[in-house]
């Protein structure tokens, strides 16, 4: 474009160019930006986020970004490394250039390194204090004065042995994490033989580990420190708060899935790939269905009866296809109307049905025993010695039910089988990986 130097058009073009440069970083205009000192560089971390800060982030986000850069500077100790890098750059660049061009850089780099080292020393007491604060979280209670003094003395002893600060702090962390107070959830009993209430910190630990399988958070610790957690209203409110948190997934996994014996289904490799080639790709989804179902029960305060008669479940696209359900998306979603499809509750999970089956066929005995012992709490005696193991596949001419009935006719086994087999036969409408069926492998 051709314009006169002093023309209005030139001013308009320059204003438009300035606006473009203000909105688009240079990286958008060039495929690659190569630093002049590409072989040996003095800049350890290049920051170019002015456009991001100015155009996209609010004040809080800018402050957080600046904090992260400062944290990177601290962790990397870049001002100290730049002293060594400068010497390498100086030796490299002055082989065929005038050294005087680089000398003005030496003193500012040295001054920044000296100031940074002084700052590191000033931070040492605060970092030791942070480890002690961490100990109160790790040990799930406030430190008593003797414990705090012992940890401080350990740090001082390590420094007197000429260990650098960073190494001494790492060992101090290790001391906190190998303490019995971290490794075990101990509760201090009162003298005598009578039962007594746990204190607030112990109650916070019980609640948090039961619901989250993890240590109490800041809010629980604060209430425990204030002596308020044993107030029934406060305890109830905190229980509901923890239940609504995403960490309740751990209760669904560690309690719900473990109770149903499907905690490890996602790694189950006992199914015959010849008979069930799709199982390996679905087993993780099967376990996830159980997790999401239990989370829904916990977070929505559903009736305990819904474990058996719920009319809904949670599936993604592949699992819905496995069940024969039609869904409009591949993502995880709730579906209703299961009872009309012959399912509902934990007895209709592919996870439970697959886990209590053999490698290539269903097992009414396994399913019935699981339902009797795990769901109903009716413990069965061990089977008598010498009872033959059922074949993995039903012999020709026998249905899977007939195979089970023939095995159960042994008088040594009949009393138990009369209790469990009807439960297992009731689930024969599902195959060994939980798909609905109207006939077994024998027809």
Where in this protein do the model-derived segments appear?
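Low-complexity, glycine/serine/threonine/alanine-rich intrinsically disordered linker
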Residues: 1-443
